[in-house]
Amino acid sequence: MTERREQRRGFWRENSLTLTFGIAFLVVLALQAVAGHAEFNEQLTVDGLQPLTFGEYLTSSDFAVDVSENWQSEFLQFFLYIFGTVYLVQRGSPESKKVHEAGIEDEQQQRMGDHARSDSPRWAGTKDWRQSLYARSLGTVMGTLFLLSWLAQSIAGTAAYNDQQLRQLEDTVSWAGYVATPDFWNRTLQNWQSELLAVAAMVVLSIYLRQRGSPESKPVGAAHTATGIEG
């Protein structure tokens, strides 16, 4: 019993970052659903229509588009950041590689092929397509998640937009027609600009500010010009 309890504690401790943010995500998503349901029903009441139940709202295009438009911008942020930091640098930022290390680096630095270690992922030690794929897997998956969530946003957005058009006795549009509307790009670009601003702020502020104990910060006593080191 004691050993099992220790194993459980160890699991929570070793995975606390993922678990904390995962639980926080579910809580905030639930709160968004509650708030969105109330707001949507207020609009339906103003339009003289029957309010939706909470279950009906959760399966509606309005809820889907509100969720997916935020997801796609987050995945885009990480996709651009992952690939951008391969070649782009910022002197003094722990978020950047050292200026002279810009680029994909050689196999020895990346522990690939003949330089793979016993604890390296299996595909890192191969010399075929598997190594090439695995060497770009993080950015590829982030890019794929961005495209899928962007597609989900556009499809859900089309349905939500057409529902609104019907309530106003106006013509509906096709998917291609919706993607060309100001509504779609307003939803999309307002999320993109906020994500890009957040990344730029993190890169610049981490040059001069510190957070003791955080790997996202340089050590408190590190010089402002120190690049690519973490606390």
Feature locations, PLM:
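Alpha-helical transmembrane segments and their helix-start/interface "positive-inside/aromatic belt" motifs
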Residues: 5-26, 127-144
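Domain-level detector of nuclease and nuclease-like folds
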Residues: 113-155, 160-161
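Extramembrane terminal tails and long inter-domain/linker segments of multi-pass membrane proteins
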Residues: 1-9, 92-129, 213-231
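Short, motif-level signal for alpha-helix interfacial/capping segments enriched in acidic residues
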Residues: 46-57, 103-104, 168-181, 223-225
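Interfacial/capping segments of alpha-helical transmembrane domains
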Residues: 34-52, 157-170
